[in-house]
């Protein structure tokens, strides 16, 4: 079996460690590759490479950096389908999703920041006839990106794009579950002309993350993952006063009012729960439906959910793919059993799919529970699988209070034809990413991130680029300096 390793100093890096692990295809359980586990010596090699790369990259003009990033965008788009197929093998998601979204939206973000890079500027202000000051936005240095396994290459692009556009170097650690496409991204960056060492990839488990958060030469850590892990990463980073961005978990509400377009609302609920087989941090897993349309909503939801195609992720007709691992599949199935035991009514799904040659994969049927109560564990806890909870509500004030009754605050959505109500409700919802009569779109221009336990900082948008810089203030004296000392 092929041995995959790290990408350091513009090339594949064999590394010093003899330890390795195997990554598997979630759809059939077959091994994909053996992966080298980085040790401290490998990490030091990545750090030294990043230092050298940073000196070259940060000295280039913003226009020069922009041109190189745009070359990478062109290569990514040219190889979209090839990269999508590898992403499917790594993640188990349907090929129709990977082709349309994963590489495309990541490339969009790189292109966006390539355009923004030349706009980074400081300010100048006169103080009096003898003094003025100016500011410079300077790169932080070496930044670390720690990725998740649901959108591996997209996350690598989302994290690297603003970091590189601002003149930083990055060391990226993909999830050990999905280590392959980050290596392809590194190769593409090099092919586009990125100086050696500016984007490095180190492979491994949580120990590599600990090396990154502990290393004094890392200036910033951007992490995507589960909230509990994020707190550990943030705590470790604080010991050396690293800047952090945390994109964490959620238990997001989708609110459907009585005047909503029913077809659209059902479509959104399905996207918000079954896209990428439910392995999306922004999933709207708590679907609140007004009592007057509840029965019609549930009836249409059942009919349409049962038509979804669960199957081979490489089949273009497949709509629901495989969960990332056997362990995660077991966790999702356990949550389903807990929901049944709690008294919720299983509307559809709720089982492992094994027919049509899927017995060796990690497939769970799209699942919907009705007659749910806010206190039930499956309503409160993030499941990260294709499991939807439908809840009934009567009044606007009531549903706002219930929607906010969670430790999370990542996303929220409202479906209504009443524009005043839409804005009024969204303004009261405690969530960082909100949609009105839509769900899931996340354009490069829009900053995304969570409230409460769902994160700190933002990905995408103008403000994220600024967070990969530090401000230097320079005061200039035009006249003789007057000392208070003789």
Swiss-Prot record:
| Record-stated family | Belongs to the aldehyde dehydrogenase family.
Record Pfam families? Aldedh
Organism, by scientific name, is Vibrio parahaemolyticus serotype O3:K6 (strain RIMD 2210633)
| Domain of life from the UniProt record | Bacteria
Q: Which residues form the signal peptide?
A: none
- Which sites bind K(+) 1? 23, 90
Q: Which cofactor does it need?
A: K(+)
The identity of this protein, by name, is Betaine aldehyde dehydrogenase
User: Which BP terms in the Gene Ontology apply to this protein?
Assistant: glycine betaine biosynthetic process from choline
What's the EC number here?
1.2.1.8
Instruction: Specify which residues bind K(+) 2 according to the UniProt entry for this protein.
Output: 241, 452, 455
Q: Which residues carry this modification: Cysteine sulfenic acid (-SOH)?
A: 281
- Active-site residues from the entry: 159, 247, 281, 459
- SUPFAM superfamilies from the xrefs? ALDH-like
Q: In which pathway does it act?
A: Amine and polyamine biosynthesis; betaine biosynthesis via choline pathway; betaine from betaine aldehyde: step 1/1
Disulfide cysteine pairs (residue numbers): none
Into which EC class is this enzyme placed?
A: oxidoreductase
Q: Which reaction does it catalyse?
A: betaine aldehyde + NAD(+) + H2O = glycine betaine + NADH + 2 H(+)
Going by the UniProt record, its keywords in alphabetical order are: Metal-binding, NAD, NADP, Oxidation, Oxidoreductase, Potassium
The record's annotation in InterPro entries points to: Ald_DH/histidinol_DH, Ald_DH_C, Ald_DH_CS_CYS, Ald_DH_CS_GLU, Ald_DH_N, Aldehyde_DH_dom, BADH
